[in-house]
């Protein structure tokens, strides 16, 4: 999630003495905002297993100003029942904020499922070319005018005109790019699921995903990202990453170019080992963002890298 978009949308509604209930499976920087920064401002934060509606209900029983979650989560692909969590959050007197980066505006529509605010790192799929940094916040006109507008007007975290223009140009091709990326990601996920050197594949579009049925209800497709464990641990994982030729190593995602990263040592390196373990982020986990290259070329690069010594 874009830090400015994410922190900006929570601060107008969250004040010292109030509570934020969040799923624990978050992008590393967002986890830092929720778990470390908000408490410094006197805001109580509670992290729950986002898949467990009972955990949400228990945490929200004491009231909350904001509920927050990612679905699918980065990088373990946890799917959250957005409609159910929205109902529970509203019952507690709060608003639900959803980070919809992995799903994009095309594959999942949290506002239609009951969320109040949706945030995007526009740097990802919306730009799609790795050219600029930016975030986007979607909400009701009343929320924008009464809560978000004054905060932005007086603190100034606004896009430059040039970056805004780049993102608008990116939106023109978003549907075409995401459709191609999703098809490629699905093909890679199916291929890896049967590979002897892969011990686990996490992709919402696979029937083997533990929340496949929920993903089918909430999302139009499985998305453009695949996460998987390379058998053999960290050393084998790094060998695989270093051997890729067509795919670049980068923390970005949603780009026209296929990208991979090692979450345990990059996006989630700030977390303690036991925290990463609870989120299923092991040393063997790879996050793969499918780009626009030819599907056969990507599969060949992956196969060659897996067989490298």
Where are these regions (language model features)?
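A short, terminal or domain-edge coil/loop segment
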Residues: 76, 101-106, 151-154, 249-267, ...
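Residue-level detector of secondary-structure transition/capping positions
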Residues: 64, 189, 245-248, 306
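Short phosphate-engaging motifs
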Residues: 144, 188, 233-236, 294, ...
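Conserved PLP-enzyme active-site core in the AAT-like
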Residues: 1-5, 9-197, 202
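N-proximal accessory regions
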Residues: 163-186, 191, 221, 229-232, ...
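Conserved C-terminal alpha-helix-loop-beta "cap" of PLP-dependent enzymes
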Residues: 200-286, 290
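PLP-dependent enzyme catalytic core of the Aspartate aminotransferase-like
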Residues: 19, 26-28, 35-36, 44-46, ...
């Amino acid at each position: 999630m874009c830090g400015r978009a994410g922190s900006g949308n929570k601060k107008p509604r969250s004040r010292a003495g109030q509570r934020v209930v969040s799923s624990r499976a978050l992008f590393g920087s967002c986890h830092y905002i929720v778990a470390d920064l908000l408490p410094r401002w006197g805001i109580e934060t509670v992290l729950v297993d986002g898949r467990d509606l009972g955990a949400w209900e228990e945490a929200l029983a004491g009231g909350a100003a904001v509920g927050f979650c990612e679905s699918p989560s980065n990088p373990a692909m946890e799917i959250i029942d957005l409609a159910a969590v929205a109902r529970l959050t509203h019952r507690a007197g709060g608003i639900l904020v959803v980070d919809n980066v992995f799903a994009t505006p095309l594959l999942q529509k949290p506002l239609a499922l009951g969320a109040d605010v949706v945030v995007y790192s526009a740097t990802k799929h919306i730009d799609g070319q790795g050219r600029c940094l930016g975030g986007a916040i979607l909400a009701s006109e009343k929320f924008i005018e009464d809560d978000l507008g004054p905060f932005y007007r007086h603190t100034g975290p606004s896009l430059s005109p040039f970056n805004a223009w780049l993102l608008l140009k990116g939106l023109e091709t978003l549907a075409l790019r995401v459709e191609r990326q999703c098809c490629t990601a699905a093909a890679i996920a199916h291929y890896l699921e049967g590979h002897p050197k892969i011990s686990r594949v996490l992709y919402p579009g696979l029937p083997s995903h533990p929340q496949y049925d929920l993903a089918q209800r909430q999302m139009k497709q499985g998305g453009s990202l695949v996460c998987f464990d390379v058998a053999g641990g960290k050393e084998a994982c790094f060998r695989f990453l270093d051997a890729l030729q067509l795919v670049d190593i980068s923390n970005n995602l949603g780009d026209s170019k296929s990208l991979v990263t090692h979450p345990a040592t990059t996006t989630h390196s700030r977390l303690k080992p036991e925290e990463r373990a609870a989120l299923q982020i092991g040393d063997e986990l790879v996050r793969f963002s499918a780009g626009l290259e030819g599907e056969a070329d990507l599969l060949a690069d992956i196969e060659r890298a897996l067989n490298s010594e």
